[in-house]
């Protein structure tokens, strides 16, 4: 079976790993604590695709998602990798 990188599909938004150095600034800007960010499963196909490039992504890592928007050009969302909500 051929492997397919979901991040290459035009309907899948860009996913980026947020460097640890930037996490504090993002959380401060959003006025939120990391545990209150929406969650993304470590088994999500986009996370698996990022792991193929960057290696294992640990829980607690913040993922930046950039979605194309017809009204705003693009919109940015943040998710934290966490499996406890998906059990």
Curated annotation (Swiss-Prot):
Record key words, sorted: Cytoplasm, DNA-directed RNA polymerase, Nucleotidyltransferase, Transcription, Transferase
Assigned EC number: 2.7.7.6
Gene Ontology cellular component annotations, sorted alphabetically: cytoplasm; DNA-directed RNA polymerase complex
Disulfide partners: none
Coiled-coil annotated residue ranges, if any: none
Endpoints of the signal sequence: none
Record InterPro entries: Arch_Rpo5/euc_Rpb5, RNA_pol_subH/Rpb5_C, RNA_pol_subH/Rpb5_CS, RPB5-like_sf
Reactions listed under catalytic activity: RNA(n) + a ribonucleoside 5'-triphosphate = RNA(n+1) + diphosphate
EC primary class: transferase
Pfam families: RNA_pol_Rpb5_C
Compartments, record wording: Cytoplasm
A GO molecular-function annotation: DNA binding
Stated family: Belongs to the archaeal Rpo5/eukaryotic RPB5 RNA polymerase subunit family.
Family matches, as HAMAP family: RNApol_Rpo5_RPB5
NCBIfam families: PRK09570.1
Task of the protein: DNA-dependent RNA polymerase (RNAP) catalyzes the transcription of DNA into RNA using the four ribonucleoside triphosphates as substrates.
Quaternary state and interactors: Part of the RNA polymerase complex.
Name of the protein this chain belongs to: DNA-directed RNA polymerase subunit Rpo5
Species, as recorded: Thermoplasma acidophilum (strain ATCC 25905 / DSM 1728 / JCM 9062 / NBRC 15155 / AMRC-C165)
Classification of source organism: Archaea, Methanobacteriati, Thermoplasmatota, Thermoplasmata, Thermoplasmatales
């Amino acid at each position: 079976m051929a492997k397919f990188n979901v991040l290459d599909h035009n309907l899948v938004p860009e996913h980026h790993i947020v460097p640890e150095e930037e996490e504090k600034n993002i959380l401060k800007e959003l006025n939120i604590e990391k545990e209150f960010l929406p969650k993304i499963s470590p088994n999500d196909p986009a996370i698996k695709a990022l792991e193929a490039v960057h290696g294992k992504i640990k829980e607690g890592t913040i993922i930046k998602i950039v979605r194309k928007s017809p009204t705003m050009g693009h919109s940015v969302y943040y998710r934290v990798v966490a499996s406890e909500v998906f059990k």
